[in-house]
Amino acid sequence: MAEQIDLKTFKTDVADYEAARPEYPIGITDWITDEFLIDETSIILELGAGTGKFTPRIIASHPKEIIAVDVYPEMLDVLRKKFPNVDCRAGSAMAIPLEDESVDLVLCAQCFHWFANEEAMKEIYRVLKPNGKLGLVWNTRDDTVPWIEKVSKILGRYRKDAPSFVSWKWAELFPGHGFGKLRYCAFPFSRCLTVEELHTLMNSFSFIYKLPEEEKEKVHAELDEIAKTIPRVQNTDQIKLCYQTMAFSSEKEPAK
């Protein structure tokens, strides 16, 4: 069973998070539209919306309304400035500020592992309309690339017991708690960034951000050594970071 999580254990620099975290591949919009049958009547809740990294892909599916909820007001402030037509509300997965059976789809990008517990599942079930859907999305690094695998090992060393996608504990909730089996899709993509931006990306992980400065310096020194071995994109100072976007869907089942 997935464990109860204190959301306040997640802490990072909002500017670093917004600057460094990747966007999502364009193909994910087709997944949203086709998997969840989104049209001009659909109301979508983006739960754990953060600074709005995933929001453009939802907007591109052209629903009737998007409601963005996050526990951190400072992240919502960034989202609100970027997308003023999105209804932003402070709240958590354990206390969603919406009426019963009010949305067609709940989407969680890069965050469900932080609140993968029975209380959150009950709340998600509550706000979904009958036959409503739940979508879970994560950008994951492609560890088949040797240098990316080395970076992931550094992160794994410091992640310890921090909630994460890679633990798969979140998946223990399905099927169950009013939801059916998970369906799965994957979308490969890549992005180019400088070594400096790679350092900023490293800082955006909460368990790195919270390290003592001396320990953090060791992490970045190790990252510099790895960076020396990474091929540059032709005629630039950039490197290519490869990802897989992993997308899961489930449907609300009738109450028993």
Swiss-Prot record:
It is found in: Cytoplasm; Nucleus. It comes from the Eukaryota. Probable methyltransferase. Its main location: cytoplasm. This is Uncharacterized methyltransferase-like C25B8.10. Its EC number is 2.1.1.-. One of its GO terms (cellular component) is nucleus. Keywords: Cytoplasm, Methyltransferase, Nucleus, Transferase. One of its GO terms (biological process) is methylation. GO terms for molecular function: methyltransferase activity; trans-aconitate 3-methyltransferase activity. Belongs to the methyltransferase superfamily. The keyword Transferase applies. It holds the Pfam family Methyltransf_11. SUPFAM superfamilies: S-adenosyl-L-methionine-dependent methyltransferases (SSF53335). The lineage of its organism: Eukaryota, Fungi, Dikarya, Ascomycota, Taphrinomycotina. InterPro entries: Diverse_substrate_MTase, Methyltransf_11, SAM-dependent_MTases_sf. CDD domains: AdoMet_MTases (cd02440).
